[in-house]
Every structure is written in structure tokens, then in C-alpha cells.
């Protein structure tokens, strides 16, 4: 299977998001890379499902709470930017204050 560098990046992010999702389901508090990966993967999947940029900006803030992450992680992530593929092309989605 031949993958472009962009496709490899998306696959790595999705895999990290799955790992974070499993750890969260087991009750573990997520660290910085896990939190970013989980939110980013969810935004990418939402774009694939046909949600709009505005919907994803709001949705991204509902994925994790301060109780889901280790101490201090929420403050380390002021925003997350994800290049997501929508039915009409690739767009940049910015989620401000993703962990509330």
C-alpha cells in the first residue's frame, strides 16, 4: 500500500486518537499528546461525516473535560488546529479552549 506523507500523518493521528479513546474508556487521565490526538481525530471524523466547520468548532469543545486529563493539561492547550477533509475540500478547523 502506497501512502502519501499527508495520508501517513492522518493515519498516525487517527491511531493515536484510538489509543487515547481506549485509555479514557479505562478511566485513565489523558496526557497532552493523547488529548490533542483524541480531539483532532474526532474533528477529522466529523468532517468526513459531513459536519460543517462551525459545527466542528463547537463539537471539539465537548469531547474532553478537565476531569478527563492530567492536571495542567487543559491550560497547555489554548486551541487546536486541524486540517480536515470535507466533501468540498480541505479546510482548517480551529477549536478554541478545547478542554473546559
Swiss-Prot record:
Family of this protein: Belongs to the urease gamma subunit family.
Main location: cytoplasm
Pathway in which the depicted protein is active: Nitrogen metabolism; urea degradation; CO(2) and NH(3) from urea (urease route): step 1/1
Listed GO CC annotations: cytoplasm
Compartments reported by the entry: Cytoplasm
InterPro entries referenced in this protein's UniProt entry, alphabetically: Urease_gamma (IPR012010), Urease_gamma/gamma-beta_su (IPR002026), Urease_gamma_sf (IPR036463), Urease_subunit (IPR050069)
Molecular function, one GO term: nickel cation binding
GO BP annotations, alphabetical order: urea catabolic process
Protein name per UniProt: Urease subunit gamma
Classification via Gene3D superfamilies: Urease, gamma-like subunit (3.30.280.10)
Record keyword Iron present: no
Record keyword Ribonucleoprotein present: no
Subunit structure comment from the entry: Heterotrimer of UreA (gamma), UreB (beta) and UreC (alpha) subunits. Three heterotrimers associate to form the active enzyme.
Gene assigned in the entry: ureA
Keywords: Cytoplasm, Hydrolase
Amino acid at each position: 500500500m502506497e501512502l502519501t506523507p499527508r495520508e501517513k500523518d492522518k493515519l498516525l493521528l487517527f491511531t493515536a486518537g484510538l489509543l487515547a479513546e481506549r485509555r479514557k474508556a479505562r478511566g485513565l487521565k489523558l496526557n497532552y499528546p493523547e488529548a490533542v490526538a483524541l480531539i483532532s481525530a474526532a474533528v477529522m471524523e466529523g468532517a468526513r461525516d459531513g459536519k460543517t466547520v462551525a459545527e466542528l468548532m463547537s463539537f471539539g469543545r465537548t469531547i474532553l473535560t478537565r476531569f478527563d486529563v492530567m492536571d495542567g493539561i487543559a491550560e497547555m492547550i489554548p486551541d487546536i488546529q486541524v486540517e480536515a477533509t470535507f466533501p468540498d475540500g480541505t479546510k482548517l478547523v480551529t477549536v478554541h479552549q478545547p478542554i473546559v
